[in-house]
């Protein structure tokens, strides 16, 4: 990714949910909280949907907390049914995400030290791969029920939050997070890991903990 936040772009956009208008189909959604403070850089979290999903599904991961915590949220859609890196090659989805970030940085005054990437299921796997490859951009990564980490050259040392249900029959925990988290720990990453009783889902208490872990308002 080459997009990077810059100087304050001008008046803050009106609060609400927007299509960015940069893709003919499966556009990126941007959510601007009413509590956004003019003249103060805001935290941004990029959210990635699971397989078969779209931007609305990604946005819904944290949208219920955006107002209280003054979070700007952005949710792209994969170009096909899931993210390209999950299929083994980073390509068109990375380009679309970069276009979206460039547009967002022109609209919103974003704090360069408070940018996160997160996702659920395939989106969590992609968030890990893209986040670890762009650790100079993303300070934190949230991975709800990831399957694996797509290989890529890594930069920076983002902090990582991982959650997984102990009864997940889509991405069974013994083959996924219980292997990934120790690996990340051995590689020196700061990882917060939460298992919960349940399946392939993101329970409200896990979402709440992830928000508190972000610590951004």
Predicted segments with their positions:
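A domain-start/cap signature at the N-terminus of enzymes
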Residues: 1-44, 89-92, 122, 130, ...
């Amino acid at each position: 990714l080459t997009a990077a936040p810059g100087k304050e772009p001008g008046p803050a956009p009106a609060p609400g949910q927007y299509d960015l208008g940069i893709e003919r189909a499966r556009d990126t959604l941007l959510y601007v909280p009413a509590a956004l403070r003019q003249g103060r850089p805001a935290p941004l979290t990029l959210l990635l949907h699971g397989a078969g999903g779209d931007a609305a599904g990604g946005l819904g991961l944290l949208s219920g907390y955006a107002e209280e915590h003054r979070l700007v949220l952005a949710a792209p859609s994969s170009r096909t049914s899931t993210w390209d890196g999950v299929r083994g090659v980073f390509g068109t989805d990375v380009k679309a995400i970069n276009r979206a970030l460039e547009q967002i940085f022109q609209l919103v005054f974003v704090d360069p030290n408070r940018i996160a990437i997160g996702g659920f299921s395939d989106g969590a796997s992609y968030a890990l791969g893209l986040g670890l490859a762009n650790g100079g951009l993303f300070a934190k990564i949230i991975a709800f029920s990831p399957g694996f980490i797509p290989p890529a050259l890594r930069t920076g040392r983002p902090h990582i939050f991982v959650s997984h249900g102990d009864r997940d029959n889509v991405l069974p925990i013994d083959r996924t997070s219980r292997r990934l988290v120790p690996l990340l720990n051995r590689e020196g990453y700061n990882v917060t890991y939460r298992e919960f009783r349940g399946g392939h889902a993101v329970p409200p208490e896990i979402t709440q903990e992830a928000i508190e872990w972000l610590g951004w308002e």
